[in-house]
């Protein structure tokens, strides 16, 4: 058994998550974690809501609530959505816990002690109308590198480069359209140039990465400069140095603290499990691989910023140093970044109304239909487009007509003719029977190898190819025509049921909810594919602060089945099954498109009204 770390990108708690988000970080990470558990490995899968930074402050101001109140609301919304999607976290927590604050401040102090954090000055954007610091991502302009319009003050989505707001050409505020002014202010900086050689050397040893991810990551080191890791803001983690720790208007930059969440969540999990040091098996052992799942817009922070923070903490940059009390931290084994998913040909944008939220699609359609679509048509290695027509087609033609119908056919024939799993009569076996069983057994190696390589689309295709071959076997053997040879009939149905069971094991990481139904349809008892649940907990260091976490029990041999062919149980009762998957009415496509158009129009009108109101306030102030 090996320890496997599965770190999942932290959704930002300024609104609900949409399908584009979970296509990048959610379903792929869960498929991988479930597979590794079935392989017998000890998986620790963590994440949480990212709750600091100026965007939450700005949104809270709009709504007339505190940042903590806004974060509390969306922490709960996001946790419920991801739990309902079946993402099997060992712990899904949040960044506003005292535990997270302590770990972040320990990281900062040791990086400072090792000489990789220093004090300097930087220009910051100020709103002329309010005098307040403007969030980097709320400033837009022309990218100075690729000259794309709409680049943000923290990053250009077109070329992927990190930016500072004062680097933008013709910058304007997204909040009210005014031109910001820039002032020098004191900040702490992470000395990325002093860490670049070690970071790049680590990158060049990476194997098995998606070429686009590795090439982009290496390209980040063509020109490396220090990055400010503090902000002029009153919402975030206090800066743990004298003269700053009590300053209400200086806080750590959200991206410095958010990536440390993987470590702090692991420590919180260990503390809640009753063994406070258990996390070290995943973080202080070089033999333990860590896999990070995200969308491609987060590559920079996971292949440059977070590794640099760990190298600085470890004392492994050009200035030397030594690790702090957390010990030497293991750098990522692999950054598994997906491309972007669009919606009906348009880029997902919550603010522009181009969106389908997780909670909305799950309220209307089965969860495994959503998971299947993301796995089969998601943006694994190239951009993909979510369309309602393709979503309905995948559900109806693949899940319902092929896989679901196969399970129902086999279970129905067994229930009708035997009422229980019949035995194999060796003398009645044919080469065709043996070939199918050999194929379904061998599929564990081929499908598993593809999941190991993070080629989940290919893995799913191979599993569904087996489903197609089982359907062909049923059609070729025609068990409904075997009237006078019960031993041959029983053998055929046993072979078919065993192959279906094997296919169900292969599909379990992708379709955990329906795999339980298939297991039961073939006479299986107990839990086949465990699901996560929500628990209400108290902050470990501030008992007055309560919040929901996603967690679960996933134990091989108890509620996790192995990644291999398990013999079905002869004599297990089988009754007439209910359909595993229901078809979606074709008219749902037009209904969803009409709903999308109506929502898009309403959101655009609301955003325009808000912007007009802001401009009116500015105009009134100038008169």
Curated annotation (Swiss-Prot):
Keywords: Aminoacyl-tRNA synthetase, ATP-binding, Cytoplasm, Ligase, Metal-binding, Nucleotide-binding, Protein biosynthesis, Zinc. Its EC number is 6.1.1.10. It is an enzyme of class 6 (ligase). It catalyses: tRNA(Met) + L-methionine + ATP = L-methionyl-tRNA(Met) + AMP + diphosphate. GO terms for biological process: methionyl-tRNA aminoacylation. A motif ('HIGH' region) lies at residues 11-21. A motif ('KMSKS' region) lies at residues 347-351. SUPFAM superfamilies: Anticodon-binding domain of a subclass of class I aminoacyl-tRNA synthetases, Methionyl-tRNA synthetase (MetRS), Zn-domain, Nucleotidylyl transferase. Zn(2+) binds at residues 143, 146, 156, 159. Gene3D superfamilies: HUPs (3.40.50.620), Isoleucyl-tRNA Synthetase, Domain 1 (1.10.730.10), Methionyl-tRNA synthetase, Zn-domain (2.20.28.20). Is required not only for elongation of protein synthesis but also for the initiation of all mRNA translation through initiator tRNA(fMet) aminoacylation. NCBIfam families: metG. This is Methionine--tRNA ligase. It comes from Bifidobacterium animalis subsp. lactis (strain AD011).
């Amino acid at each position: 058994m090996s320890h496997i770390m599965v770190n999942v990108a932290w959704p930002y708690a300024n609104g609900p998550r949409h399908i584009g988000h979970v296509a990048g970080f959610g379903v792929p990470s869960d498929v991988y974690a479930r597979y590794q558990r079935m392989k017998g490995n000890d998986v620790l899968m963590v994440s949480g809501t990212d709750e600091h930074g100026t965007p939450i402050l700005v949104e809270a101001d709009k709504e007339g609530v505190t940042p903590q109140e806004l974060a509390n609301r969306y922490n709960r919304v996001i946790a419920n959505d991801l739990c309902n999607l079946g993402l099997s976290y060992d712990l899904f927590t949040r960044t506003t816990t005292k535990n997270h604050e302590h770990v972040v401040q320990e990281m900062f102090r040791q990086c400072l002690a090792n000489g990789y954090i220093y004090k300097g000055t930087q220009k910051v954007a100020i709103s002329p109308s309010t005098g307040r610091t403007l969030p980097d991502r709320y400033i837009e302009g022309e990218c100075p590198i690729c000259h794309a319009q709409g680049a943000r003050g923290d990053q250009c989505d077109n070329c992927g480069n990190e930016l500072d707001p004062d680097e933008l050409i013709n910058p304007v505020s997204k909040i009210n359209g005014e031109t910001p002014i820039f002032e020098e202010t004191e900040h702490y900086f992470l000395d990325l140039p002093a860490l670049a050689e070690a970071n790049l050397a680590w990158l060049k040893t990476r194997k098995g990465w998606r070429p686009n991810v590795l090439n982009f990551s290496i390209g980040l080191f063509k020109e490396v400069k220090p990055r400010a890791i503090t902000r002029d803001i009153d919402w975030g983690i206090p800066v743990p140095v004298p003269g700053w720790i009590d300053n209400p208007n200086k806080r750590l930059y959200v991206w410095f603290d958010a990536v440390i969440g993987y470590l702090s969540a692991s420590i919180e999990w260990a503390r809640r499990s009753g063994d406070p040091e258990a996390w070290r098996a995943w973080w202080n052992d070089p033999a333990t691989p860590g896999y990070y799942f995200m969308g491609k817009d987060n590559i920079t922070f996971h292949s440059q910023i977070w590794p640099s923070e760990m190298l600085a903490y470890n004392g492994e940059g050009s200035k030397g140093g030594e690790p702090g009390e957390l010990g030497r931290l293991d750098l990522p084994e692999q950054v598994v970044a997906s491309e972007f998913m669009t919606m009906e040909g348009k880029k997902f944008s919550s603010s522009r109304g181009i969106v389908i939220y997780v909670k909305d699609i799950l309220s209307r359609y089965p969860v495994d239909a959503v998971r299947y679509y993301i796995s089969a048509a998601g943006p694994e290695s190239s951009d993909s487009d979510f369309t309602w027509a393709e979503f309905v087609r995948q559900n109806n033609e693949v899940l319902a007509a092929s896989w679901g119908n196969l399970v129902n056919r086999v279970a129905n024939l067994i229930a009708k003719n035997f009422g229980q799993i019949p035995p194999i009569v060796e003398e009645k076996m044919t080469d065709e029977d043996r070939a199918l069983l050999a194929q379904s057994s061998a599929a564990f190696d081929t499908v598993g190898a593809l999941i190991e390589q993070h080629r989940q689309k290919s893995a799913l295709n191979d599993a569904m190819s087996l489903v197609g071959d089982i359907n062909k076997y049923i059609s070729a053997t025609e068990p409904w025509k075997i009237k006078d040879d019960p031993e041959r009939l029983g053998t055929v149905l046993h072979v078919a049921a065993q192959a279906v069971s094997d296919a169900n094991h292969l599909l379990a990481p992708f379709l955990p909810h329906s795999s339980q139904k298939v297991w039961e349809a073939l006479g299986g008892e107990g839990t086949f594919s465990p699901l996560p649940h929500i628990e209400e907990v108290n902050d470990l260091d501030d008992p007055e602060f309560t919040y929901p976490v996603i967690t679960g029990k996933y134990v091989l041999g108890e509620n996790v089945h192995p990644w291999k062919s398990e013999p079905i149980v002869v004599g297990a009762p089988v009754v007439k099954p209910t359909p595993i998957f229901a078809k979606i009415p074709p008219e749902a496509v037009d209904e969803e498109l009409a709903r999308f158009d109506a929502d898009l129009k309403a959101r655009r009108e609301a955003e325009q009204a808000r912007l007009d109101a802001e401009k009116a306030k500015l105009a009134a102030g100038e008169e």
